[in-house]
Each structure stands twice: as C-alpha cells, then as structure tokens.
Amino acid sequence: MADRNRSFSIEELPSHLILDILTSGCLCAADLASLESSCRMFRGCHGLYPLKYPSMAEFAAFELCKAHSIFSCLPPNAQKELFDRCGGIWKRVLRFLQSVERSCGIVETSAGNQMQITTGRYHTLLIHDSEVYSCGSSICGALGHGPDNTRCDNFSLVKFPSLSRVVHVSASHNHAAFVMQSGEVFTCGDNSSFCCGHGEVGRAIFRPMRVEALAGIPCKQVATGLSFTVFLSREGHVYTCGTNTHGQLGLGDTLDRPTPKIVEHFEGLGSVVQIAAGASYTLVVSSDGTVYSFGSGTNFCLGHGDQHNELHPRAILSFKRKNIHVVRVSSGDEHAVALDSSGLVYTWGKGYCGALGHGDENDKTSPALLTSLSSYLAVQVCARKRKTFFLLDDGSVCACGWMGFGSLGFPDRGTSDKVTKPQILDSLKTHHISQISTGLYHTVAVTNKGLIFGFGDNERAQLGHESLRGCLKPTEIVLQMREATAVEAESA
C-alpha cells in the first residue's frame, strides 16, 4: 500500500500525465514559459514526443495550438506561415492565438478579473466580472441608466432584468447592445431607426431591453453601426436590423428592418466567426478566412475597387486571390482594417490624415498590406474616424491617423496633428495592453493586470475621469464604480 505521508516530486509523475494536466487546464503561453524557466521537468525532453519539440512545455503549447479554434481552421500553408513568423516557437504561436481571441472578447486579467472595453461616440462601456458599467454622455439612452441619467462622470452600473452574466458588448454612435451568457441579447439607445430590434418602437430606449425577436436564437457577438445592428448566433448565422439605406443589412434591398432578420446569403457558406459594423457598411469574416462586405461603398470601404453599394454580401477577392486567411476585421467610419492569420495587417478606404498608415493620405480602393508593420505580429486592429490602432503580441500599441483632441496617445504631438505611419505609443510601453477601443475623440485600453488607461477628449466624461477635460497622455482611470441614481432596469 502506498505511503500517504510520503511527499512526491512532480518529476515522479508519468510524462503523459503531466502533459494531460498542461493541456487540459486554462494555461496561457506565459504560464508555459514560466513553468519551463522554473522547473527542469518542463524544460527537458522525456521521450514522450518527437525530438522536434525541445521541451514538454513546447509540446504542450503545440497541442494547445492544434485545438485552438483559430488555428484549427487554418489550411496547412497558413499554419506553417504563422509558425515561421513566430520563429518556430509554439509558445509564441499560442500567445498570438490567445491574444487575438482576448482582444475581441473578454480579457482574463492576472488579478482574475474578466473585462471588456468598448467605446461609442461620446461614451464608454465596460464589462467587469460579468457586470456592465458605463460613463460619458448620451441623451438617447445609450448609457442604459434611464431618462434621468444622460451623463455619468464615473463608471456606473447598468442593471439588467436578466440574471444572466454579460459576456459581450458593443457601442456605437447612439445605441448599445449586450450579449448574455444565456445567449440573450439586450439593447438600448436611440431606436428611431429600429436599430435596437424591438419592432415598431420608434423612440429612445433608456434601459436595456431584451430583443424578443431573437428568443430561441442564442447569440455570441453583436456589432453596432450607425443606426443598425448586426448579430452573430452561436451557430454562426448572421442577423441584422435597423436602417438599410445603403444595403448595410445585407438582405438584398434597401428596406429598413424593425426586428432582426437572418442574412440568408451566408447559409451553406460555412460558419461566420466575426462581424464588424461601420457607419453604413458591414464586414463579416467566415471560418475559412473569407471577408464579405456589404452596404455603402463610399470611400472604398467595401474593398472591391469601386464605390458601388452592395445589397448582398460580396467576398473581397483580393484576399482570396492571394490566399490570405483573415481572422479579424475592424470597420472605421471611412476606412477598414484586417488582420490575417500570420499577424499581418491590411488597410483600405479613405486615407485622409494618414488613417491607413501608408505614409501618405492617399485612398486605397482595395486591401493593401501595411508593410511598416510586417516585422511585427499584430493581434488586434481597431479603426474609427480617421485613426487606427494596432495591438502587437508583446502588448505594445501602434497608432496612426488624426490626433483628434489627443485620442492617438502621443503627448508630444499637437491635438490636430497627423501621424501617417504607425508609431509605437511610448507612453504605454511599461504596460502590457490586452485590448484597446477608440471612440470619436477618445481612446481606452485595458492591460493584462486589469488597469484601464484613457486618453483624448473627456468633455462629456467619456473617459470616466471626472477631474479631467481631456488628456494627451494615457492616464490611468481608477474605477470608482457605483450605481447611477434612480437606475431601475426595464423589464423586457
């Protein structure tokens, strides 16, 4: 019988058991690197796997990469290109995959908090441990605090009639949408265009209301454009509602829709993995790396080489011709950005103020590789009006475009300067950024430790910093989260 009082070393465990532990938990690439550097058990080669893996930690990283939802969808040539771009190190491949995943969803901080940040026109929404807080200004209800609370100087709790936890949020000019852990979707804000999806309710909705038209259709993602909304179901189907003047709903016509309708074009084309809503156009990424665009062709935002509107989703062929597998996109007001499976970035649309990052202000009629970032691995792209942010896999941030009240984060630049090529934000170099979002004139970032930094205009309290009117340098926002006065969530 085994001696229960005897202590065991981890090195006495069978290698296959240790490997199972490493790959069945929630370890990130940094965890594997720490184990490898601190214990010889994880540094050594123990005959459990081919010699091409120098350590158990490296083999565990490979196994985690194989199972990752992004990596498993890549064709073999794209997998190899990513591996080569990561210097032949599986832990770095894993870091890239996990960083891409975090940057567009929930960030798990080192302190154990779960966070997501998103910015609207003059407001900011924050998920903090499954609860939503908002700050800023909105007369149309986008803050979610009722008709008597149209401005919040600090992050204030938004209440929901559902007990389910919030897992995803999107903010636009004048409305917001929330996805719950249950798959339910809630919206609030200006519904004069029916973008909130509640039928013929042409009024502002000041507190989150459940979108009943999506009952029985669990969703995982939402994207809010200017007066329209896009929903992505867990099964990978796309639904849209709201203004459809330019065909941005992708339904083959220009009729507005008061409730979400399925975009049938995607049926049979494989699962959709990401949606992005611009001012009057929509981008959709499928699991095979194809990017579809529809809506207003103004400023070449659709990426088809012309400015024609598209009423149906249309694949951007320049990506297909070059076998570029896109994993994430961002829809700005006048331009768009894409991130491919090897961390390369492409921009197109209106080049005013250098928002495309090519060193000039020229427009790009179709996606163009951003060569100045080719030596980096980007994990998030974020576009808004005349500016673009690029989050790199080491946690640093690059930006280009119009300074716009300091919203690019370069304190040595004037508030109306133009930055025509991506430059690293030295002001954030001492922090590892996990997610970034930019509004009209303000920007907010979350670090891997759960710190929040904001910069740009704060005239309407959109930074949640009541003592500042604005700041050129990223400034930490100390959360003083509270309940807004007289907030009572409206029952659906």
Where are these regions (language model features)?
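Eukaryote-biased RCC1-like beta-propeller repeat architecture
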Residues: 2-492
